[in-house]
């Protein structure tokens, strides 16, 4: 896969398919290009659009973190610095952003800052911190320390330990309890599709209701039964159908 220098770091990226608009996939807090599996290709095929996937700094085969870092503004940094530079260098003017979990929050921050987008498709987005989500992240830390989770993450990330702590340490920082991006939602004026699993261990429908109440564009909510934190894996048919319908309506 090719690499691109963004904000002083070499980031791995991949193109799939062709056609407009361009779909930009923003992975979750422990995600990567490979962890999307074949889902982006399915969306690209169903819509006739090209898809861009990339690994954020510290993820996948992109540059390893130079040193462990914890910042509660890591999603702001991505949305306001790295993502605009990446899209400019790849000459992507008005994308459709498809974000999962932290990636969905990054999409909202990017659009809320006034950057041009055609629409936002959000899976399991976070706009504020819920106590049940913190408990789940604490549980994942225990799993990382006591199970083979580091080895499993190592299949996808050059330095799984630093990747894990980039995400986990930030979310468990006491300051992160006050993290909230609801103030940016009023500046989101494009169509939004927000998808949430009933059994998501990191967030509830309260996240989606907050988005719908605050954004200025149209906002469709999709609540899926039998679905956890990864709707595209737990309910792939329903999610693919909803995404394809949403994206075709934007054309």
Region spans (language model):
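Catalytic active-site module of serine/aspartate enzymes centered on a nucleophile-bearing elbow/loop
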Residues: 220, 225-251
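Active-site loop/oxyanion-hole signature of alpha/beta-hydrolase fold enzymes
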Residues: 47, 53-94
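Short alpha-helix in the alpha/beta-hydrolase fold that links the catalytic acid
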Residues: 190, 204-213
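Short beta-strand/loop motif that positions the catalytic acidic residue
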Residues: 188, 194-196
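Active-site nucleophile elbow and catalytic-triad environment of alpha/beta-hydrolase enzymes
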Residues: 167-184
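Conserved HGGG/HGGXW glycine-rich cap/lid loop of the alpha/beta-hydrolase fold
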Residues: 9-65
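Acidic catalytic loop of the alpha/beta-hydrolase fold
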Residues: 198-203
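Flexible "cap/lid" loop of the alpha/beta hydrolase fold
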Residues: 105-148
């Amino acid at each position: 896969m090719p690499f691109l220098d963004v904000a002083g770091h070499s980031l791995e990226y991949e193109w799939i398919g062709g056609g407009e608009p361009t779909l930009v996939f923003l992975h979750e807090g422990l995600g990567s290009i490979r962890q999307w599996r074949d889902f982006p290709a399915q969306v690209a095929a169903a819509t006739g659009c090209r898809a861009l996937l990339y690994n954020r700094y510290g993820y996948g085969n992109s540059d390893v973190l130079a040193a462990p870092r914890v910042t509660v503004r890591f999603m702001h940094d991505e949305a306001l610095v790295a993502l605009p530079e990446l899209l400019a260098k790849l000459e992507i003017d008005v994308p459709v952003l498809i974000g999962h979990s932290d990636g969905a929050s990054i999409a909202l921050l990017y659009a809320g800052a006034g950057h041009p987008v055609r629409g936002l498709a959000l899976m399991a987005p976070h706009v504020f911190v819920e106590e049940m989500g913190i408990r789940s992240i604490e549980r994942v830390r225990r799993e990382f320390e006591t199970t083979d989770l580091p080895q499993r993450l190592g299949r996808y990330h050059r330095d799984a330990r630093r990747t894990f702590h980039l995400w986990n340490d930030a979310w468990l920082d006491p300051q992160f309890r006050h993290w909230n991006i609801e103030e940016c939602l009023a500046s989101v004026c494009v169509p939004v599709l927000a998808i949430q699993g009933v059994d998501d261990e990191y967030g509830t429908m309260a996240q989606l209701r907050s988005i719908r109440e605050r954004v200025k564009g149209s906002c469709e909510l999709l609540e899926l039964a039998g679905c956890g934190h990864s709707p595209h894996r737990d309910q792939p048919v329903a999610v693919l159908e909803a995404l394809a319908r949403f994206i075709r309506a934007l054309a």
